[in-house]
């Protein structure tokens, strides 16, 4: 802890502007950029104040400008500041599983200290080119629409795009649940600038679904790192790196395949923009920081597969005003292997997960990677849905009866496909009342092939809604027929 630090380099606060603190050090003893500074003192009310800051600028005249990782309430000019001579470091290893940390690696779940001495600095180089694994392989998620139309790459980066309230966090929770159960893999969750209530709900739901076991933490499958909306921008800007550092240890030292969830990568950019303005940098397009591309690259390039293990990253991307050309989502796009775009139109129809089958893309959807059969089924599904989309204007003006026989068949099959792309989630059982379904890729393909071939043309549309495999569709259709 801070109290055990040797005070070899001590400065004092000269200025405080919100989360930005200026510190003066003795001549010739300036800390380096990204060094952690600690301030431990008592405020005027006699309460303990403990703040960690990160050096961002060297101002000249032996002064540095640092950004605080927690609230600066209670700090005053003249307080003593200790240079730790190292970057912020966080605990790593199996002892982190089942625990909740803040940006500087302190546990915030009231379960006592972390039982590990292993710590890693949050700033590191990306793996070298020669260490990277370049052979592509698909990561099965058990979610039909994802596995069929926009499959995820093992060790790749996936973006979950959507406006407010279309279900990004629910999909993330379902993926954590499915990966833990189907693959037995560990996950690291970075809560970047999202609602504290959601963080609390996520933790409780993970306990309910046995992803976290508070009685026996060694059985837990996920470590959580939170820097929520109420935290200063410094914490929100760095919490993604803290989570990534924990994931890197599982990849490089434990030699595991890890899932890294970042919810929400837009808040990481937003926090960087706030810090940039506080540091007095000239804003770039739409008021974002001029270093937007660099900051994003430093984070994203560390998320990759090496010959030892992989980090597969799933990042929720809030799209401001549903505008995909905004610099924040646009910069994120450049790094992604797959995009899962959530559509407000589908959500309003009650189709969940509200993944847009035409807008969602993946570099893995190639015959050489997924095989010809998978590729052909996926493209046939998309072309049927695309034709339905083109016909919707005609239907709205003239009605369904004015369409040709072939087009009416396309519409009927497209509506079944649209409904069959929905599926009940394990983590949403409380809301839907339907038991969750994990659908294997071969079952997904079998179902869509049967719809496309016309084998199921005589089944009613509602039989395809909110089910798992095609066998459940047939059973539901028989049940509906019996009730009619």
Curated annotation (Swiss-Prot):
It is an enzyme of class 7 (translocase). One of its GO terms (cellular component) is proton-transporting ATP synthase complex. SUPFAM superfamilies: C-terminal domain of alpha and beta subunits of F1 ATP synthase, N-terminal domain of alpha and beta subunits of F1 ATP synthase, P-loop containing nucleoside triphosphate hydrolases. InterPro entries: AAA+_ATPase, ATP-synt_VA_C, ATP_synth_F1_bsu, ATPase_a/bsu_AS, ATPase_alpha/beta_chains, ATPase_F1/V1/A1_a/bsu_N, ATPase_F1/V1/A1_a/bsu_N_sf, ATPase_F1/V1/A1_a/bsu_nucl-bd. It is found in: Cellular thylakoid membrane. HAMAP family: ATP_synth_beta_bact (MF_01347). F-type ATPases have 2 components, CF(1) - the catalytic core - and CF(0) - the membrane proton channel. CF(1) has five subunits: alpha(3), beta(3), gamma(1), delta(1), epsilon(1). CF(0) has four main subunits: a(1), b(1), b'(1) and c(9-12). Produces ATP from ADP in the presence of a proton gradient across the membrane. The catalytic sites are hosted primarily by the beta subunits. This is ATP synthase subunit beta. It comes from Trichodesmium erythraeum (strain IMS101). The gene is atpD.
């Amino acid at each position: 802890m801070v109290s055990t630090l040797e005070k070899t380099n001590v400065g004092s606060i000269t200025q405080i502007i919100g989360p930005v603190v200026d510190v003066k050090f003795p001549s010739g003893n300036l800390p380096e950029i990204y060094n952690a500074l600690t301030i431990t003192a008592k405020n005027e009310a006699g309460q303990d104040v403990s703040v960690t800051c990160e050096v961002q600028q060297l101002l000249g005249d032996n002064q540095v400008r640092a950004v605080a990782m927690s609230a600066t309430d209670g700090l005053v000019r003249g307080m003593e500041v200790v240079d730790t001579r190292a970057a912020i470091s966080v605990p790593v290893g199996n002892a982190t599983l089942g625990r909740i940390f803040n940006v500087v690696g302190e546990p915030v779940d009231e379960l006592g200290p972390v039982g590990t001495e292993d710590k890693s600095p949050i700033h590191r180089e990306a793996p070298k080119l020669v260490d990277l694994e370049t052979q592509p392989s698909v990561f099965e998620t058990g979610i039909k629409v994802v596995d069929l139309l926009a499959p995820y790459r093992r060790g790749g980066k996936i973006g979950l795009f959507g406006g407010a309230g279309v279900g990004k966090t629910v999909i993330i929770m379902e993926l954590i649940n499915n990966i833990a159960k189907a693959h037995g893999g560990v996950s690291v969750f970075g809560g970047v600038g999202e609602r504290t209530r959601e963080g609390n709900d996520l933790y409780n739901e993970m306990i309910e679904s046995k992803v976290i076991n508070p009685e026996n933490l060694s059985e837990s499958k996920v470590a959580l790192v939170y820097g929520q909306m109420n935290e200063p921008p410094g914490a929100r800007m760095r919490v993604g790196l803290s989570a990534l550092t924990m994931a890197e240890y599982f990849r490089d030292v434990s030699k595991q395949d890890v899932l890294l969830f970042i919810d929400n990568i837009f808040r990481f950019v937003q926090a960087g923009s706030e810090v940039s303005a506080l540091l007095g940098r000239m804003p770039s397009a739409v008021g974002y920081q001029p270093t937007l591309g660099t900051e994003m690259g430093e984070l994203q390039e560390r998320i990759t597969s090496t010959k030892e293990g992989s980090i597969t990253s799933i990042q929720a991307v809030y799209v401001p005003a549903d505008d995909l050309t905004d610099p924040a989502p646009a910069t994120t796009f450049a790094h992604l292997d797959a995009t899962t775009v959530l559509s407000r139109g589908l959500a309003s129809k009650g189709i969940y997960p509200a993944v847009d089958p035409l807008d969602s893309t993946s570099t893995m959807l190639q015959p050489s990677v997924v095989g010809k059969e998978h590729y052909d089924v996926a493209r046939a599904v998309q072309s049927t849905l695309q034709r339905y989309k083109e016909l919707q204007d005609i239907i709205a003006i003239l009605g369904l009866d004015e369409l040709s026989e072939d087009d009416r068949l396309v519409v009927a099959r497209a509506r079944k496909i649209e409904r069959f792309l929905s599926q009940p989630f394990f983590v949403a059982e409380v809301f839907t009342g339907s038991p969750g379904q994990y659908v294997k890729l071969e079952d997904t393909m079998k179902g869509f092939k049967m719809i496309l071939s016309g084998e199921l043309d005589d089944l009613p549309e509602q039989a395809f809604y909110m089910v798992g495999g095609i066998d459940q569709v047939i059973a539901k259709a028989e049940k509906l027929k019996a009730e009619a």
